[in-house]
Amino acid sequence: MLLKNAVQLICYPDRIGNNLKDLYTVVDTHLSEAIGGLHILPFFPSNADGGFSPLTHKEVDPKVGTWDDIEAFTAKYDLCVDLTVNHISDESPEFTDFIANGFDSEYADLFVHVDKFGEISPDDMAKIHIRKEKEPFREVTLSDGTKTRVWCTFTEQQIDLNYESDLAYQLMESYIGFLTSKGVNLLRLDAFGYTTKRIGTSCFLVEPEVYQILDWVNQVALKHGAECLPEVHDHTSYQYAISRRNMHPYGFALPPLLLYSLLDANSTYLKNWLRMCPRNMVTVLDTHDGICIPDVEGVLPDEKIKVLIDNIDARSADPIMRRSAANIHSVGAIYQLTCTFYDALMQNDDAYIAARAIQFFTPGIPQVYYVGLLAGCNDHELMEQSGELRDINRHYYTLEEVEQDIQKPVVQRLLSLMKFRSNYPAFDGHFELNYSNNSSVAMAWRHGDYYCHLFVDLNFKTVKVTYTDVETGETRHLEC
């Protein structure tokens, strides 16, 4: 494994302070012993979706910093960066060249031209997995007045790439080579499941094409000294498929599983999952997205999922729903719950520390989202200003707020756990799920003479961590 076996921080380039320099100051001052890496969300020039509509992956948005700022991180920490494999901005040089030169553009085949599919029947439209309140197509007018349609899964500004063309692979390889030259060693493959377009299917995670694309990206990344973290929210079986392909899967089932376990004081389903979950995961409790429900389907019974949703609903903004391209106004089951993880646990410090302790003892590399690091609460004001439901969990912290919140008792307890997880050698060894009753969890790690054990009582939300001091041979207790 190329990555340090340590906690990583997930953060925006401009929401802990104003820019990358501010972020580095906070990390170096408060977190240097607590983390081994960072996932810095998109810092590229972008015109939509909070950075996820990049004009290029070869520039840093000057509003947040320079490549020197990025390389300051990579000199000391692992760095995960988003590679938006599905789309690029409509303001990118490639798409603006297509608008100017039409189908004579050297980049014309880089995009998915909807009209090549002919008329799409209502039945086929109904199958397409969509992410907005309209069909995933956009009509554009070329400079000569010709109108044509291109595929755009997300916002109108995010134009999907055509993986039936060599141009898409050439673009991705150039991005991967450039990012790794700056020290990036983990590529988060954003929205990769939407790269497959085959009418008559969901156009989402279509096999075998999706794995052919993934395997190619992973091969190129490994050649350049980086690993891959494909991002997909769907049935947990996809995470196993990713793991088998020598890539890191997300442990996206863990957040809803832990919420259910702590709110209902029932560890049965959590322990069932821990017995079989991939061992090379990246685990999260919170991210810049909401708490996704599809990831836990098949792990939690449907009636337990309903109990969880009903419990959290009062502390969440409106949920994000699943939609059909045939009828954009019809909604299916809940896709994401929108609230901070701390609020989901009713701002209960002990429950929150219990959740983090279980995350840190779960196999894989743990990531902590910046709002979660500071035990942040729902930012209703930002959400109402932007109209984006997920902004409830995307607070802009001033440096003064960080200095204040980092001293909160719950945050100091979390930092103690993070330092232990990032530095105690037992986590380089073997995972053990020990026997416990259905209202508790017992987990351990062993590596040579190093041994650590976690016991969590889900009723009382108490956490007990013990570990071996190899210098004295004594068993010690971690204050958390």
From Swiss-Prot:
The keyword Transferase applies. Signal peptide: none annotated. This is Glucosylglycerol phosphorylase. It comes from Marinobacter adhaerens (strain DSM 23420 / HP15). Optimum pH is 6.5. The active site is at D190, E231. It catalyses: 2-O-(alpha-D-glucopyranosyl)glycerol + phosphate = alpha-D-glucose 1-phosphate + glycerol. Disulfide bonds: none annotated.
